[in-house]
Each structure stands twice: as structure tokens, then as C-alpha cells.
Amino acid sequence: MNLRLLTLALAAVAAASPVDIQERQLSGGNELRDGSCKPITFIFARASTEPGLLGISTGPAVCNGLKMAKAGQVACQGVGPKYTADLASNALPENTSPAAIQEAQDLFQQAVTKCPDTQIVAGGYSQGTAVMDDSIKRLPDNVKEKIKGVVLFGYTRNAQEHGQIANFPKDKVKVYCAVGDMVCDGTLIVGPAHFTYLGNTGEATQFLLGKLSASSSSSSSSGSSDTSSASTSAAADSSSSSSSSSSPFGNLGNLFGGL
């Protein structure tokens, strides 16, 4: 791979994808570390050479979409500064650096420890997809369970991982690979198709919102079921107690199957 050409290409897409001042301010990027707990935590790893913690393209777009849909309920956290989003790390065995993988794992762990009631959604773009893949598959089960959905744009490990994240539910992952994006075919060849994913951020946001909604509905149903079971159990205990008190043999009748 020609790293110089890749650098020029990524610089060009950065210049072609401006984010206005209001959007930059809305995006934040270090809100898990520095802010208060929110019902939803979005953790994102940017593409190579993108500045900031969320980057300047797909990361802020999804963050802002979540915040507009769930006003006041979302904390957005980018992976960095140990994840430097340098070009050379793409050529490493895991397609990113060990430091980046560990930092992402630490952020997921921090979200669960600091904010035990938060629901986590995540995403990555280009090298950032490798950061997500390599970190999530190594997490303990109790942390994975808190992650409700993951969106991956230009998945650099798509071929190696067969379009999913190892050791993680496939239905929680949405991969966006544009036609002609050779990065998704297991190469490090970057062409124009790799810079088209802003057009997928609206759909990706809806995917994450759907996973959050499904999780909330499941929790509500579980709570209702538990309440109903408790009520039924209490009623049965009350009935049993009433029957026992009216019998001269108390609970002895139960020893014979109610005969």
C-alpha cells in the first residue's frame, strides 16, 4: 500500500466533509470521561488521520443523530488519545495498534463501571472498525451484554471476520461496505468508494435507535412478567395459607398430593 497516496486521499475527504461549528459543539467527544452519566453512551473510533476524538465525518454524524432523537440522553465518547489513528497501524496484524485496542476496551469497561444503568452503542470508520472489532470481541460477557448495537463503516476486517465481530451477536452489528470499497475485501487499497459513508449515517443511526428501543421494550416486558409472576405467586400463597388454616390437618394434606 502507498501510504503517501492514502494520506492525500484521506486529507481530501476531510476537506470535502466540513462539519459546521454548531455541529462540532454538539458532537462533544469526551463526554463519558468528563461528563455525567446518560441513559445512552455512544463510543466511536474514527478513521485514520481524522482529527479529534470522534473524527469529522461519520462519528459526529451518528452522535448528532442520536442526540437529536434522544435529547439530553446521550453521551458521545471517541477513542483517543492513545488511539492516534495513524496510517501505519493499519498494516499491523490486528489492523490497528495494541494501545488503541486496549483504550477502547477500557472505555467500554468505564461505561459499565461508571454508569451501570447506561445502554451502550458503538461504531467505527475505516481503521476505527478494527479498533471496535478487536476490542469488543475481547470484552467479558457482562460488558458485551450492555452493548446494544454496533455500526461499522468501511470495515477493514470485514473479510477476515466474515462480516461480523467474533464472539458477539451478529444481529447487533450493522456493516456498511460500499460497492467498490476494496478495504472491505481484505486489502488496504483505498479508493473513492471508501469515502462515501456519510450517506449511510442516517440509516446507521436508526439501526442503533432500533436496538435501543428493542432492548428497552424487552426490559419492560421482563419487568412486567416478573411483577405478574410475583403477584400470581403471592395469590397462590395466600390461597394455600387460607386452605391450610381451614383444615384440621394444616399442611399435612400436601404430603399426599392434595388427596
Curated annotation (Swiss-Prot):
Residues 215-259 are annotated as: Disordered. It holds the Pfam family Cutinase. SMART domains: Cutinase (SM01110). One of its GO terms (biological process) is carbohydrate catabolic process. Disulfide bonds join C37-C115, C63-C76, C177-C184. The active site is at S126 (nucleophile), D181, H194 (proton donor/acceptor). Its EC number is 3.1.1.74. The record marks S48, Q127 as: Transition state stabilizer. It is found in: Secreted. Transmembrane segments: none annotated. Its main location: secreted. It catalyses: cutin + H2O = cutin monomers. Residues 1-16 form the signal peptide. Keywords: Disulfide bond, Hydrolase, Secreted, Serine esterase, Signal. GO terms for molecular function: cutinase activity. SUPFAM superfamilies: alpha/beta-Hydrolases. GO terms for cellular component: extracellular region. The keyword Secreted applies. Belongs to the cutinase family. Catalyzes the hydrolysis of complex carboxylic polyesters found in the cell wall of plants. Degrades cutin, a macromolecule that forms the structure of the plant cuticle. This is Probable cutinase 2. It comes from Aspergillus flavus (strain ATCC 200026 / FGSC A1120 / IAM 13836 / NRRL 3357 / JCM 12722 / SRRC 167). The lineage of its organism: Eukaryota, Fungi, Dikarya, Ascomycota, Pezizomycotina.
